[in-house]
Amino acid sequence: MKKLFLIIGAPGSGKTTDAQIIARDNADSIVHYSTGDLLREEVASGSEYGKTIDSFISKGNLVPLDIVVGTIINAIANAPKDVIIIDGYPRSIEQMEALDEKLKAQNQVQLVSVIEVEVSESVARERVLGRARGADDNVEVFNNRMQVYLTPLKDIETFYSKQKVLHKINGERMIEEIVSEMESFIKGKM
């Protein structure tokens, strides 16, 4: 059975970087997908599907549920390894419920943990505005993305706490410390 780890955190929390390092250092057993990267790859392809996605991403808005869930389920189904890390998902109660429904309806993938990388809004803002990753890294879009992240957060935390799969990590430390803690946690659950 494949084991799924979801990593959530504010924009700029470091969730993608943390997951990339862990997957790179454990390439024999762990594969990582970033929801944002999966969607950005589709946009970069220039497809009609990509243009639809871009009309949401460029404004900092959530991509429609069916597109995101389809993208995630497709990535899980085609994952070449048995341990899968997906960061940036879920970002809404609807995304959470849709994935939960899909996972309950099958027996190939087990959600092992949802890891929340915690950072303050000021640290997140400083990090995002200090990087130049894309057109979506400006103050207005950051503020929108932060609201989009914070609005459903308590409900997402409660949902996964009840399932006993929520694990919080302090994201305001040196990246080596964060990665070390996250990697130990994941390996302990493999």
From Swiss-Prot:
HAMAP family: Adenylate_kinase_Adk. It comes from Helicobacter hepaticus (strain ATCC 51449 / 3B1). Residues 130-136 are annotated as: LID. This is Adenylate kinase. GO terms for molecular function: adenylate kinase activity; ATP binding. Belongs to the adenylate kinase family. It is found in: Cytoplasm. The keyword tRNA-binding does not apply. CDD domains: ADK. It catalyses: AMP + ATP = 2 ADP. The keyword Cytoplasm applies. Its main location: cytoplasm. Keywords: ATP-binding, Cytoplasm, Kinase, Nucleotide biosynthesis, Nucleotide-binding, Transferase. Consists of three domains, a large central CORE domain and two small peripheral domains, NMPbind and LID, which undergo movements during catalysis. The LID domain closes over the site of phosphoryl transfer upon ATP binding. Assembling and dissambling the active center during each catalytic cycle provides an effective means to prevent ATP hydrolysis.
